[in-house]
C-alpha cells in the first residue's frame, strides 16, 4: 500500500535544529522553532499553562465527543480575545474551529478553501516552512510565493508584501 510513496523534501529548519544541537558554543541562541526554552534548552511548561490545564481538568465532567468545531464556549472566548467588540463578531461573520496544531490548522483551512473556491490561489511567504507548499498543493490549491525579508537590509521587504 505504501510502496509508491516518495520521500518528502527535508525541512531546512529541522536541519538548523540538528546543527544547533551539535554546536558546542555555550553562547548560541536557538531562534529556529518558535518555542520558549530555558537556559538549559528545556521547553518548560509555563505556570499559567499548568493552571489553565488544571482548571480545565477540575471542571471537566465528560470525555464525550464535542463535535467537529470543538468546544464552542472556548471558541467564543477565543473570538472575543482575537477580535474584541469588532463588528465582524457582532454581525456573526466569524467561525472558529479547533485544530490539531498549526499544520493541522493549515490542512483544515486548505480543504475548506478548496471546497469554497476550487480556483483559489494561496500565497505563502518565501521562505516558509517546508511542508506548507506541499500541504496546500495536496489539497488541490494553486500556490504562489511572496518575499517578506530583504536580505540586503536584514529587514522587512514591505514593497514585496
Regions of interest found by a model, annotated:
Residues 2-66, 77-80, 84:
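N-terminal "arm"/small-domain region of PLP-dependent enzymes with the aminotransferase-like
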Residues 55, 60-161:
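Conserved core of the PLP fold type I
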Residues 1-5, 146-149:
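Short, basic, glycine/proline-bearing loop/turn elements
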Amino acid at each position: 500500500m505504501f510502496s509508491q510513496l516518495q520521500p518528502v523534501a527535508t525541512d531546512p529548519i529541522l536541519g538548523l535544529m540538528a546543527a544547533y544541537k551539535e554546536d558546542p558554543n555555550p553562547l548560541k541562541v536557538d531562534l529556529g522553532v518558535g518555542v520558549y526554552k530555558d537556559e538549559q534548552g528545556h521547553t518548560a511548561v509555563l505556570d499559567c499553562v499548568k493552571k489553565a490545564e488544571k482548571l480545565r481538568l477540575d471542571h471537566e465532567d465528560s470525555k464525550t465527543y464535542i463535535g467537529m468545531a470543538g468546544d464552542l464556549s472556548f471558541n467564543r472566548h477565543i473570538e472575543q480575545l482575537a477580535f474584541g467588540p469588532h463588528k465582524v463578531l457582532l454581525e456573526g461573520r466569524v467561525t472558529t474551529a479547533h485544530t490539531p496544531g498549526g499544520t493541522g490548522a493549515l490542512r483544515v483551512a486548505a480543504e475548506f478553501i478548496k471546497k469554497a473556491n476550487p480556483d483559489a490561489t494561496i500565497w505563502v511567504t518565501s521562505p516558509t516552512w517546508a511542508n506548507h507548499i506541499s500541504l496546500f498543493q495536496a489539497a488541490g490549491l494553486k500556490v504562489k510565493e511572496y518575499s517578506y525579508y530583504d536580505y540586503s537590509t536584514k529587514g522587512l521587504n514591505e514593497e514585496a508584501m
